[in-house]
Amino acid sequence: MKKVKAAIIGSGNIGTDLMYKLKNSKVIELNAMIGIDSESDGLKRAKEAGYEVFDNGIQAIIDNPSLADIVFDATSAKAHSYHAKILEELGKIVIDLTPAAYGPFVCPAIRNNDFLDKQNVNMITCGGQATIPIVHAINEVANVTYAEIVATISSLSAGPGTRANIDEFTITTKRGIEEIGGADKGKAIIILNPAEPPILMRDTIYCEVKDMDEVSIYEAIHKMVERVRTYVPGYSLKQEPMFDGNRVTVFLEVEGAGDYFPPYAGNLDIMTAAALKVGEEFATQIVSEKKRGVMNEAK
């Protein structure tokens, strides 16, 4: 199968981790790594790996539109708001790994292929990718009236982009809890833990439900965990769900694959693994459409 060309904008922690994941993709060929700091570790690693590198940001795509059909934006919410319009005009499929929420939210464990007609999709946040599937699973069987999540990540795994987007993180994750998770009302909190040695990503999900059914909720949570594990193997329950009246509390832990950052950075891993899965679905569709076009021409 001919691979679909892609580029990454943003050579920070998330962009660099994604670079290593794309290396093993069977349907996507990473063509370029784009940043704004020629001395960044991400651009240096990309150059060493043999990828074309640019340090002039979005201008690289403007000057070389044939670089990629799919663009992964791993910059910041503010930067993506500027990039989105340019990439839309250039006809690029955009997978946004910032909390900009310019396009519709996508969580691969919840939505199947109903995003493939969109040009720009948003991967919510790392905390959202970890917790929203659980909120959704509970809501499917018990009607969640309120959901609150606390995402705790190692301070070392939070780069400048993450730190600059704390407000956007809470707002976008809250929206995702409600719009994708299905909760009537949501709330999100992020904690950067400076502990040494660094802790694994940990997430607490607290839900108030209208229709309590412990057995159905328990089964729904476990099924969803297994679904997420198909693309994030380090995703797991820290302990069994806790029930108290109309309240359910779930404790998660996410261990990263160690592609770029050590395994404690599960927050990077769940974001990039989810983006890779979504990108590969877009790439598969592009290849299928091209094949169909060739067959129609042959007729």
From Swiss-Prot:
UniProt entry keywords in alphabetical sequence: Aromatic hydrocarbons catabolism, NAD, Oxidoreductase
Reactions this protein catalyses: acetaldehyde + NAD(+) + CoA = acetyl-CoA + NADH + H(+)
Record-level GO BP terms: catabolic process
Active site: 126 (acyl-thioester intermediate)
Keyword Kinase in record: no
Keyword Coiled coil (UniProt): no
GO molecular function: acetaldehyde dehydrogenase (acetylating) activity; NAD binding
InterPro entries: Acetaldehyde_dehydrogenase, Acetylaldehyde_DH_C, NAD(P)-bd_dom_sf, Semialdehyde_DH_NAD-bd
NCBIfam families recorded: ac_ald_DH_ac (TIGR03215), PRK08300.1 (NF006157)
Name this protein carries in UniProt: Acetaldehyde dehydrogenase
Record organism: Bacillus cereus (strain ATCC 10987 / NRS 248)
